[in-house]
Amino acid sequence: MALVVICGQPCSGKSTVALCLSVALKESESSSTIRIIDEASFHLDRNQSYANMTAEKNLRGVLRSEVDRSVSRDNIIIVDSLNSIKGYRYELWCLARAAGIRYCVLFCDAEETQCKKWNEQRREKCEATYDDTICLRSQIEEVAGILLCLNYVHVKMVF
């Protein structure tokens, strides 16, 4: 039915958006199966998964394979990961197109300082956080054709 790819800086609210979207879609009259695919789905540690380029490439391969297995006209798949590489988002678009389903990119637009603040708050609560090195080297390649841009400064998210 649809493939939703959420992208943004580390700790920019992607998982919160994915969860809110999933709940809102489940509460709608849609009979579709809603599924979130993320690192936690495979019991992978986000810091190990993004520690170096090889690990990140392997993670993208695992996520892509799971998306490929999951896309269908009866499912709504939400991909909750950094999804920072334009070529990777294009690969996911190709999977959606081949399956004959819709494709949407949600970009969580949060300031870098806000992301660091949220990451630190999570660290204080002993929740899963990103290493500072991952936050420093993370850059989102150009996001063109965005259907929805979530900016936490200007938009109050209501689902």
Cite the ranges covered by each PLM segment:
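Short, surface-exposed basic-aromatic patches at helix termini and helix-loop junctions that form
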Residues: 24-27, 91-101, 106, 120-124
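Conserved GTP-binding G-domain of TRAFAC-class P-loop NTPases and closely related GTPase folds
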Residues: 112-159
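Conserved phosphate-donor/acceptor-positioning beta-strand/loop module used by diverse small-molecule
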Residues: 80-81, 101-115
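Short glycine-/polar-rich loops that comprise or flank the Walker A/P-loop
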Residues: 1, 73-74, 99-104, 147-150
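P-loop (Walker A) phosphate-binding loop of NTP-binding proteins
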Residues: 9
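Hydrophobic anchor at the beta1->P-loop junction of P-loop NTPases
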Residues: 6
